[in-house]
């Protein structure tokens, strides 16, 4: 009789111990949801987590990005060439017109993700043309990857035999996210599960089942999108779409108790753009100084004022540059401290 009881007690103690361990593990698991409109920089943040909190990119993984980088470079120059026609811009050198025609033809015939020498020579000649540069300066009037200038001005390096993409090359590469991508890593005794969700409108209906049990939402909005329209709808300003989306997320009943952090991203692109294009393009009521600080702060206020529960719910915001590893490292460190403070104080672990 006694032996049976003690075995039962032992089993009970073991079960209790396991339940306690499971509870601690759950308490240390952080579900992070990355949300934001298309091309705001969500996937770049995910790449940074791999660089900062995992082992970064192996040589093999870096080499896999070559095809993407070549594809991005070709898409960019083709977008500029097409815009030359729609914006009615003349080539600085009429010989470039033939180069442009040749390039269009080659783009349809080459193997995707490759960059033959003849093609890279044509692209480099086009990129140096004054008309192409004038068209590039008007990039907000058509759809162009943020990485266009980065890759096109460094194409000679990218096509050198034996080229291995650098971390920066990888960070600037762009593949549209479809579906949901999960990344797991540990930091400050926490186990993170980060979910990157496609930002284009057609992808958003896939978000809903990710919502349950989310610890923190990082909402990413591109500061530089204030003078741009959507890929999916050229009537809608990207900043307005981002504000609309943020409004629906931050005031959603699902997220009443969820920490929300706002990343105002692409501050590097914004700081250059604001020198040339006035914020009133997006916000006609804005009559403040058209400086990085004033305009940036005005955008931040537009987002934060959408929070209907300001008295009980604080939204933390950071200006970010997702391609800058040190900046992301610093900001994510601060975000983790917020998560610890907000969500884990109840479980007695911290």
From Swiss-Prot:
Positions of the G-alpha domain: 28-350
Annotated region G4 motif: where?
261-268
User: Which Pfam families is this protein grouped with?
Assistant: G-alpha
Q: Where is this region: G3 motif?
A: 192-201
The record's region (G5 motif) falls at 320-325
Regions of compositional bias (Basic and acidic residues) in chain numbering: 7-21
Q: Please verify whether the record's keywords include Lipoprotein.
A: yes
Could you give one GO CC term from the UniProt record? neuronal cell body
Q: List residues, modification Phosphotyrosine.
A: 142
List residues with covalent lipid attachment of type N-myristoyl glycine.
2
One example of the protein's molecular function in GO is: G-protein beta/gamma-subunit complex binding
The protein depicted here goes by the name Guanine nucleotide-binding protein G(t) subunit alpha-1
The gene that this protein is the product of is Gnat1
